[in-house]
């Protein structure tokens, strides 16, 4: 059997399993199940989510994408807006620009001390423990590319296709800056990867293998 046919067979079987699991989740009114999708902008975060919208029943899927706090959000505790945006039980939620993003970008750009970052991550861990106590299941994904892919961004005019997705988190940065992002992400993982909400590294140079891997995790 060719590699293409093998992958197609795996994908079809996985889709059936996922649809069955989604039905059972909705029927039991459990969850929600949240997928926090983080990592390199060019690792296919949006494409990964689109794949699950193709595979699953869209009626029970939700996507949350966050920019900087606006309006009343600025007056409330930092994690408040994430709490109030939780999707209902029995559904699956994809989060881009989650509660990790702003502290992570501030640390990687030297705008936040490690002490402050550690304090922020302690708050996040308490928040996630609270979510778990309320029945929420968390799956935290860090999509990464090998060095050849990660360190060679396309020209600005080619980046427009990614900007149009309204899901670009990091903006344009150099190889050195990306190295700092990875260092900050390692620190983040050390502080917040727990039994109930571990960080999972997802190799993303091969999009189809990436999608199958995440689908099996689900």
Protein language model features and the residues they cover:
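Glycine-rich phosphate-binding loop of ATP-dependent small-molecule kinases
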Residues: 1-218
């Amino acid at each position: 059997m060719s590699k293409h046919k093998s992958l197609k067979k795996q994908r079809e079987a996985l889709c059936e399993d996922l649809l069955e699991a989604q039905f059972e989740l909705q029927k039991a009114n459990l969850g929600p199940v949240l997928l926090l999708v983080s990592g390199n902008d060019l690792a296919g975060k949006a494409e990964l989510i689109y794949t699950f919208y193709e595979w699953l029943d869209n009626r029970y899927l939700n996507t949350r994408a966050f920019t900087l706090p606006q309006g009343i959000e600025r007056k409330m505790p930092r994690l408040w807006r994430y709490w109030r945006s939780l999707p209902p039980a029995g559904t699956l939620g994809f989060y881009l620009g989650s509660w990790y993003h702003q502290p992570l970008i501030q640390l990687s750009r030297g705008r936040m001390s490690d002490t402050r970052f550690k304090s922020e991550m302690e708050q996040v861990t308490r928040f996630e423990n609270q979510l778990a106590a309320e029945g929420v299941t968390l799956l935290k994904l860090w999509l990464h590319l090998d060095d050849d892919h990660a360190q060679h961004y396309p020209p600005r005019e080619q980046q427009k296709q990614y900007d149009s997705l309204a899901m670009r988190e990091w903006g344009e940065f150099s190889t050195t800056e990306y190295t700092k992002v990875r260092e900050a992400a390692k620190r983040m993982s050390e502080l917040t990867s727990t039994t109930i909400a571990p960080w999972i590294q997802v190799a993303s140079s091969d999009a189809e293998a990436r999608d199958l891997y995440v689908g099996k995790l689900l």
